[in-house]
Amino acid sequence: MKELILASASPRRKEILDSLGVLFSVKISNFDESSITEKDPVKRCILTARGKAENLFKTLPQNEGAQKLILAADTLVFAENTAFPNEKIIFGKPKNEKEAEMMLKSHSGSLHFVVSAICLLDCKTGQINEKHSVSKVFFKKLSDKEISAYLKTDEWKDAAGAYKIQGKASFFIEKIEGSYTGIVGLPVRELYEILNKTEFRIL
């Protein structure tokens, strides 16, 4: 059977695969995400996941990769831009607490979207399979006190959109529409569909 390599340092993605009983190893991709200049958030997310997979593939010794599948993923948070309807506001990972505060204030009392893309690369054939999910997240109106308290948890660090839905940010979520695991960082239905096209089985 093929061996699965997760090209991600994300503990959330590792936790999801572990919870599904999937056997995998981890190798970190050094792909430069800033090299993707695509403005559309969905296309950008797909291209970033693909870039991560292809970057790791190039680093594997030729005789090592024949029976391996590389799984890469990317997650972006975005919102509609009322001033410029044809553009989207993309929320990456905040660089500092001030940036995280601005993102949380933007989410407060409003709707935003979370796109997660996955890319599966067969190291033997070079074949790529890709899927993505787009989910809606509705935040309650946040008080300054709530934002301040959440920032002190440090959950905003290394989190697209400055929050982790599986943590204390769940207190702020009124509802979601779409894939919960996609919002966390790895949409499992899409993962199941992609892996079913290969010799790798998770069910």
Curated annotation (Swiss-Prot):
TM region(s), chain numbering: none
Enzyme Commission number(s) from the entry: 3.6.1.9
Matching InterPro entries: ITPase-like_fam, Maf-like
Matching CDD domains: Maf (cd00555)
Keywords noted in UniProt: Cytoplasm, Hydrolase, Nucleotide metabolism
Active site per the UniProt annotation: D74 (proton acceptor)
Predominant place of localization: cytoplasm
Gene Ontology CC, one term: cytoplasm
Family: Belongs to the Maf family. YhdE subfamily.
Purpose: Nucleoside triphosphate pyrophosphatase that hydrolyzes dTTP and UTP. May have a dual role in cell division arrest and in preventing the incorporation of modified nucleotides into cellular nucleic acids.
Protein name as it appears in the record: dTTP/UTP pyrophosphatase
Record lineage: Bacteria, Pseudomonadati, Spirochaetota, Spirochaetia, Spirochaetales
